[in-house]
Amino acid sequence: MTISTTTLGSGATTATRKEVEAKYEEERQIQLQSRGMVQDIEITRNASFEQFAKDPWAAPKQVDVETQREKLLQQAHHKIVIIGAGFGGLLFAVRLIQTGKFKANDIILVDSAAGFGGTWYWNRYPGLMCDTESYIYMPLLEETEYMPRNKYASGNEIREHAERIAEKYNLSERAIFRTVVQSLDWEEEEKVWKIAGVKLGKDDECQQPFQLMADFAIMASGAFASPRVPNYPNIFDYKGKLFHTARWDYKYTGGSIENPKMSGLTNKRVAIIGTGATAIQIVPQLARNSRELFVFQRTPAAVDVRNNYPTDPARFKSEIQGDGPGWQRRRQINFNAFTCNEKTLPTDNKVGDGWTRMPSFSVLIGGPQSLEPDYIDEIRPIDMARQSEIRSRVHKLVQSTAIADSLTPWYPGWCKRPCFHDEYLQSFNSSNVQLVDIRHDGISRFTPKGLVANGVEYELDAIILSTGYTVPVTRASPSGRANIAVTGRRGVTMEEKWANGLATLHGVMTRDLPNLFFAGTSQAGACVNLTYALDQNAIHVAHILSEAVKRQPSDCTKLVIQPTHEGEEAWTMEILQRAAGFRGIAGCTPGYLNGYGMDASSLKPEEQMNMARLAAWGQGIASYVDALEGWRSEGQLEGVEMTFLA
């Protein structure tokens, strides 16, 4: 089906909309047939793929300095162990400290990386930036008194900010790095969590077992912990350079994250597989530095304007900080109002970017109007108009009509993560850049010299995998995402709870896994600004723990806390009542947002119900936070079971 790229402006007719919807479905069917569910390789469980998991940033000298301190930390029994030292783990630690009931010395953070930052530690590819405004994304700006350098911060600056937070709250010496947690086991007799895994030496292959004991454990390892490597046929037949964007190899490419002049690629034929939010930042850099660049694309990205610019100190002080203490949270809430498409929007759009001009993204993250029966029908024309502008932008910026056609996205805006960049599309005007559209046949196989796609062998010096992260569809629990076996009372595992009918209290704790807290989207709030959602989890868990400690009698040394059965089932009913808010995702092109095209209608009724229990809070992040704050204000810890032991 051929439709004009300018189709569907403000005056679009019903017939035109039907044509576009038919085009959307046509593209969806093409991709379902060519891909369906892609099998990924578990890189941490496959010796042949360990190269994709190794840490290229850990300095041997740094490992030596930390070894003795970490041995001491491992020997002691700890009050709280947090798994993950990215922003999630840091926010849990900071909010606990701010209650006044816990000190930094009560907390240990454990991470497989060699430093703070989480995904911002691992990702250091050229062009890396965050596409959520830095003034709302970088947490604790008021507390650290830091002004971001640009509206959209570089990955380097964000990682430095994680280190800044750790230093301010005395957490720098409370982390055990290069440590892979493999299991959490509840010891019923001692009422503690036994945390076990391996400590990595200078060489990742040198592994020593470790064990920690903790009264409380918090899982904050994040959703982007493991690079996704598709199981392409004969991938290891390839004799050239092969690496993942999350483990960028500057030794091969030349340059650095501070200076992405990649002199090592000057005479190289380079391929990048994938055109998601990562690739659109890398492609302009590779285009400038490679002799030839081949971009392998299955689904075109919908790329809007980013419009980054340096922070003006005077404006930052007068306009952004101008309304006094609490400015960052108010700005975050303002941003959420637009992205969740609240019925009554604020009079001023403080962030004023591409995200806040996309009310249809509320179909994915939920919003106050999401449960209304006609909401999808009402929001669809608005989204179609936006997508039409995105398609027009492609043809305006890309000189070749054929290439522009291949780069044109035909799907609802909420189906694939929106992208924002000012150089990506123009890169395809360069004579050394070739787009390879693989949406019909995909990549057939790798060869010693390159790979085969669409029946053509491409001889390549280097292949870069921009294929994202493993987001398990059937292992959606925090333990499944992190590859950690979590076993609670009576042998109940976290995986079983998620698979067999999840119930939580507020999306942060679940029965039979006592003294364990977690971050995630299942039965919790979702929003564009991930650090805001993580912070709300952290604030809530800190409240529950600190209030429980206040209630602990002085003659009791042990506290065991978990939801009541009634409490977590009541919360789950609230989730189920709002699950229909996400119904718009069902007809999307395959991707991690919809289980790579999983057809829920083919599941048995009980399986569909179990999936619905995994949903986020369907009425938007503001409604979720209101529910938590209302619960906290009552002061009763309703739905929480506390046991005090001498």
Swiss-Prot record:
Residues 1-15 have a biased composition (Low complexity). The keyword Ribonucleoprotein does not apply. The record marks R417 as: Transition state stabilizer. NADP(+) binds at M129, C130, D131, T275, G276, A277, T278, A279, I280, Q281, R298, T299. InterPro entries: FAD-binding_Monooxygenases, FAD/NAD-bd_sf, FAD/NAD-binding_dom. The keyword Flavoprotein applies. Its cofactor is FAD. Pathway: Secondary metabolite biosynthesis; terpenoid biosynthesis. Disulfide bonds: none annotated. Keywords: FAD, Flavoprotein, Monooxygenase, NADP, Oxidoreductase. It is an enzyme of class 1 (oxidoreductase). Residues 1-20 are annotated as: Disordered. In A.calidoustus, the austinoid gene cluster lies on a contiguous DNA region, while clusters from E.nidulans and P.brasilianum are split in their respective genomes. Genetic rearrangements provoked variability among the clusters and E.nidulans produces the least number of austionoid derivatives with the end products austinol and dehydroaustinol, while P.brasilianum can produce until acetoxydehydroaustin, and A.calidoustus produces the highest number of identified derivatives. Belongs to the FAD-binding monooxygenase family. FAD-binding monooxygenase; part of the gene cluster A that mediates the biosynthesis of the fungal meroterpenoid acetoxydehydroaustin. The first step of the pathway is the synthesis of 3,5-dimethylorsellinic acid by the polyketide synthase ausA. 3,5-dimethylorsellinic acid is then prenylated by the polyprenyl transferase ausN. Further epoxidation by the FAD-dependent monooxygenase ausM and cyclization by the probable terpene cyclase ausL lead to the formation of protoaustinoid A. This is FAD-binding monooxygenase ausC. It comes from Penicillium brasilianum. The gene is ausC.
